[in-house]
Each structure stands twice: as structure tokens, then as C-alpha cells.
Regions:
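Gly/Ser-rich catalytic/binding loops embedded in alpha/beta enzyme cores
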Residues: 1-97
Length: 97
């Protein structure tokens, strides 16, 4: 554990973050935009938003799936379909009253 004076921690210190798979990270997290075409590709640097998140103390836990090519390639594939992650599901629980 790290102990620092109150107010000396960065704004997002230790906050876990999931990034969509189209946001570049220069680490072991693939940036594929949901496509096999980019599997294993290496980006030269973190995206600007990732640099700012890391500087603010956020912890990148992983990548969240998205429709292949951000659903740009076709209107025929089902919403949420990704070659890497399959069909996306809702990430919330719907309660019935």
C-alpha cells in the first residue's frame, strides 16, 4: 500500500478503466477494432486519451469489445458483432417489475 498526504494522489489514482478496442495502447493490450485483420498489430504510442488517463493514475485493465470496425464496414452485420469477440451482449441487468 502507498500512503501519501491527503490531496497528493492523482485524480484517478488506482481507478480501473476498460477501453474500447479501437483506442490505441502501447502495451500488451491488442488494438484490433474488433477485427482479425489487426490482431497482433503493434501501435507506436498510446492514444492521447490513454496518455492522459495514465498520467492521472488510472489503471488500464483491458479492452472492451465493439462492433467490427466500429460498425463501419457494413449495415448487414448484426449490431455488436465482432470477429474477435463474437456477438456482444448487454452489460447491464434488466430488472422486470
Amino acid at each position: 500500500l502507498k500512503f501519501k498526504a491527503p490531496g497528493s494522489l492523482s485524480p484517478l489514482h488506482g481507478i480501473p478503466i476498460l477501453l474500447k478496442d479501437n483506442i490505441a495502447t502501447k502495451d500488451k493490450l491488442n488494438t484490433t477494432a474488433g477485427s482479425f485483420a489487426l490482431l497482433g498489430s503493434v501501435v507506436p504510442r498510446d492514444a492521447g486519451v490513454v496518455t492522459k488517463l495514465r498520467k492521472a493514475g488510472a489503471i488500464m485493465l483491458g479492452k472492451a469489445t465493439l462492433s467490427e470496425w466500429c460498425h463501419f464496414r457494413t449495415c448487414e452485420s448484426p449490431n455488436g458483432w465482432s470477429a474477435i469477440g463474437g456477438q456482444g451482449k448487454m452489460s447491464v441487468i434488466v430488472l422486470e417489475y
